[in-house]
Amino acid sequence: MGIPDSGGAEEILKLVGLENTGKKKAKNFSLGMKQRLGIAVALAGSPDFLVLDEPVNGLDPQGIIEIRELILKLNKEKQITFLISSHILDELSRLATHYGFIDGGRIVREISAEDLEKSCRKCVRAQVSSTKALAKV
């Protein structure tokens, strides 16, 4: 495998927002830049599917936004499907169309984002024997 020409590498670096790093060594990159570099390396093989393990873990709020926008951009422009493992459910809710829940190394439930949202709505259901008494409450 590999990249046949440097133009491909430049295109990938531009895609992930690392085109202007010059000769800066990766060890001197910020955590967000390292996350984007990891995604760039994975993109070198032109995948249709990428697995990301805690891609925003440890990032500052701006870094989280940048990684989220990159994932959405790659999904939309390159039609790449992502499998993301994360404990940050709020962030997943901004990205995911489907969820899988794992317990003991096994998927115990799969659900669409729409169905998950419906099942998580807060509501109270009350049943009363006397609506007149309830009206006085």
Question: Language model features by range: what are they?
Answer:
Residues 129-137:
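Short amphipathic alpha-helix segments
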Residues 82, 114-115, 131-132:
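Short C-terminal domain-edge/linker segments immediately following a structured domain
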Residues 106-127:
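Conserved beta-strand-loop-alpha-helix hinge in the C-terminal portion
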Residues 1-84, 89-103, 107-109:
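ABC transporter nucleotide-binding domains
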Residues 58-59, 70, 114, 126-128:
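Short, charged/polar low-complexity linear motifs in solvent-exposed/disordered segments
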